[in-house]
């Protein structure tokens, strides 16, 4: 029989009609001779009633066989429920069953198919097809579909062209580790799965496409955390002849449309703009969460002359003030914060509390001479807790930025209903890598430097600034973009600044440099992490909740057991040998 509608969409207007429904048995109950079935499909749950006095013995026998997650087809008459269930969208009606067919049986599931089931992450991933039956998960993917639909409509209306770029591409340096794919035809050679379509989308601008977009899968072999996966999806844009501001206007319009259509939220445009330096110095992060205060305070000058060398001789001394919550933190609690601070390079964490109008704590005695000045500068009040870090500016910022976020969560200081977007601009072009012992691109080596700082490509690389912009939402980097280099001479200077010889640059990027000989237009763009965006809209804390078949924190799939061993024949065909490092 043809299904009449989704079970979760039956309403009062259907009372008095005969319909056919198909779905899964969510629950079966026997009460006073009647059998009640909760039938679940992707749109919700509908109550079925099977009365032995009104159905055949065959139907009754079939009903008695039903167990959770059996797949069934039913026909029946829609009636008003005697006792409405306000918790269900279908709670005003029920289906009086006249015909019942079992379409498939099911084993007992390893966990209950309900939103509040307590189950480990790996078990959820091992039985992902069951996990995805939970209503909450279905809603996540409906939301994701709405987001992508909204984005496509918006960009189509602006005459962006949707173009697919290659999945098998060339491995290039200056990024995370590539996933490599050996070539059977060209033995000893490898493709790389793209970390982004960066170069190919730039080449599309050279081809005259003018406006490109793609919702594209990307791959990075990097350590995982809650907002990262080895394969992820991004909304990728590139435009020709537009300024930084024009590109940002397009992106803001796209996000405003998504927010309105998926969350019914009117966001204020334009988004605030914050320089990279302000973000780091005031928030201790290049992706600041602006839903709460507790800004970093620079005390380096204030403490310079005191008789406490830890402070007076430190390159930088900075602090955050936990307002009105000193009594929430015992010595043991602060010790935990100290251990947390050490993860970010700090040697320790100094602190004082304001108790009965005076400083108390291990370093209070060293601050007596400047207590009044500090109190004024930090605007201290009774029961405030001050946390200090004395170290390099970078360590002080990073440590206090991380503490700021942790404490805000611990004290429930964040308004979870807010969606605070902002642009972080005026980025440094390079960042120093202790591991590599050299400067590396803060974004990528195709970013255009500012005209005022480009001369430092042959001088002090720390002074080179980029025409780059990151879009931040609630403390997460949502995406990043820049204007790109379109002049060959500038691109060669950039490669040289990064330590490439001319031969190395030509070997890795010769095709791009050659393309710059053929009228490459000014261009720029941006990419937004779709998984992360949907995660935040769904108010989840892990992107696994919005990816259908994600990997775990070991980059493996407990369901398919990927990655897996392959046969010797397959390795031989690729001229590969596996060496053990045990």
Swiss-Prot record:
Cellular component, GO annotation: cytoplasm
One Pfam family this chain carries? Answer: tRNA-synt_2
Give all cystine bridges in this chain: none
Described purpose of this protein according to its UniProt entry: Catalyzes the attachment of L-aspartate to tRNA(Asp) in a two-step reaction: L-aspartate is first activated by ATP to form Asp-AMP and then transferred to the acceptor end of tRNA(Asp).
| Locations listed in the record | Cytoplasm
State which gene encodes it: aspS
| Name of the featured protein | Aspartate--tRNA ligase
Q: Where is this region: Aspartate?
A: 198-201
HAMAP family reported in the protein's UniProt record: Asp_tRNA_synth_type1
Q: Which UniProt keywords apply?
A: Aminoacyl-tRNA synthetase, ATP-binding, Cytoplasm, Ligase, Nucleotide-binding, Protein biosynthesis
Q: Give GO MF terms, alphabetically.
A: aspartate-tRNA ligase activity; ATP binding; catalytic activity, acting on a protein; nucleic acid binding; transferase activity
Whose protein is this, by species? Streptococcus pyogenes serotype M5 (strain Manfredo)
Q: Which GO terms describe its biological process?
A: aspartyl-tRNA aminoacylation
Q: Which InterPro entries match?
A: Aa-tRNA-synt_II, aa-tRNA-synth_II, aa-tRNA-synth_II/BPL/LPL, Asp-tRNA-ligase_1, Asp-tRNA-ligase_1_N, Asp/Asn-tRNA-synth_IIb, AspRS_core, GAD-like_sf
Q: Does the keyword S-adenosyl-L-methionine apply?
A: no
Listed binding positions for ATP are 220-222, 229, 477, 529-532
| Predominant subcellular localization, coarse grouping | cytoplasm
Is Thylakoid found in the keyword set? no
EC numbers, comma separated = 6.1.1.12
């Amino acid at each position: 029989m043809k299904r009449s509608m989704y079970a979760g969409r039956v309403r009062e207007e259907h009372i008095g009609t005969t319909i056919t429904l198909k779905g899964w048995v969510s629950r079966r109950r026997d009460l006073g001779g009647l059998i009640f079935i909760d039938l679940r499909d992707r749109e919700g749950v509908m109550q079925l009633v099977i009365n032995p006095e009104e159905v055949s013995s065959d139907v009754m026998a079939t009903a008695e066989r039903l167990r959770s997650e059996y797949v069934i087809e039913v026909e029946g008459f829609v009636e008003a429920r005697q006792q409405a269930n306000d918790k269900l969208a279908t709670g005003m009606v029920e289906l009086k069953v006249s015909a019942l067919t079992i379409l498939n049986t099911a084993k007992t599931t390893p966990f209950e198919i309900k939103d509040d089931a307590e189950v480990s992450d790996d078990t959820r991933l091992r039985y992902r097809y069951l996990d995805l039956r939970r209503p909450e998960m279905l809603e996540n993917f409906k939301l994701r579909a709405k987001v992508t639909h909204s984005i496509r409509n918006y960009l189509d209306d602006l005459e962006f062209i949707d173009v697919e770029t290659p999945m098998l591409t060339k491995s290039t340096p200056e990024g995370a580790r590539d996933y490599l794919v050996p070539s059977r035809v060209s033995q000893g050679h490898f493709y790389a799965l793209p970390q982004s379509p960066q170069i190919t989308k730039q080449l599309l601008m050279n081809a005259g496409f003018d406006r490109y977009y793609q919702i594209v899968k990307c791959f990075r072999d990097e350590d995982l955390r809650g907002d990262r996966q080895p394969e992820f999806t991004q909304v990728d844009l590139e435009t020709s002849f537009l300024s930084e501001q024009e590109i940002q206007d397009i992106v803001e319009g796209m996000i405003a449309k998504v927010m309105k259509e998926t969350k019914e939220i009117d966001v204020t445009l334009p988004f605030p703009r914050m320089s990279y330096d302000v973000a780091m110095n005031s928030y201790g992060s290049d992706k600041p969460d602006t839903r709460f205060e507790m800004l970093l305070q620079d005390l380096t000058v204030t403490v310079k002359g005191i008789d406490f060398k830890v402070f007076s001789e430190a390159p930088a001394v900075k602090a955050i003030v936990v307002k009105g919550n000193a009594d929430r933190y015992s010595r043991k609690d602060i010790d935990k914060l100290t251990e947390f601070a050490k993860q970010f390079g700090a040697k320790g964490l100094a602190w004082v509390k304001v108790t009965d109008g005076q400083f108390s704590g291990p370093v209070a005695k060293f601050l007596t001479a400047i207590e009044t000045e500090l109190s004024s500068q930090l605007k201290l009040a009774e029961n405030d807790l001050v946390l200090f870090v004395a170290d390099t500016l970078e360590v002080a910022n990073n440590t206090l930025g991380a503490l700021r976020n942790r404490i805000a969560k611990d004290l429930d200081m964040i308004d979870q209903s807010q969606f605070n977007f902002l642009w972080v601009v005026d980025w440094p072009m390079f960042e120093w890598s202790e591991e590599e012992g050299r400067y590396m691109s803060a974004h990528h080596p195709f970013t255009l430097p500012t005209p005022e700082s480009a001369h430092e490509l042959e001088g002090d690389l720390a002074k080179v600034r980029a025409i780059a912009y990151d879009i931040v939402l609630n403390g997460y980097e949502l995406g990043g973009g820049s204007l790109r280099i379109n002049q060959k001479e500038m691109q060669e200077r950039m490669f040289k600044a990064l330590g490439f010889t001319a031969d190395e640059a030509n070997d890795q990027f010769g095709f791009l440099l050659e393309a710059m000989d053929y009228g490459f237009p000014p261009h720029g763009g941006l990419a937004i992490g779709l998984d992360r965006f949907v995660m935040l809209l769904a108010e989840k804390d892990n992107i696994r909740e919005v990816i259908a078949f994600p990997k775990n924190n070991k980059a493996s799939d407990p369901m398919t057991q990927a990655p897996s061993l392959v046969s010797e024949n397959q390795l031989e065909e690729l001229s590969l040998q596996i060496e053990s490092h045990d």
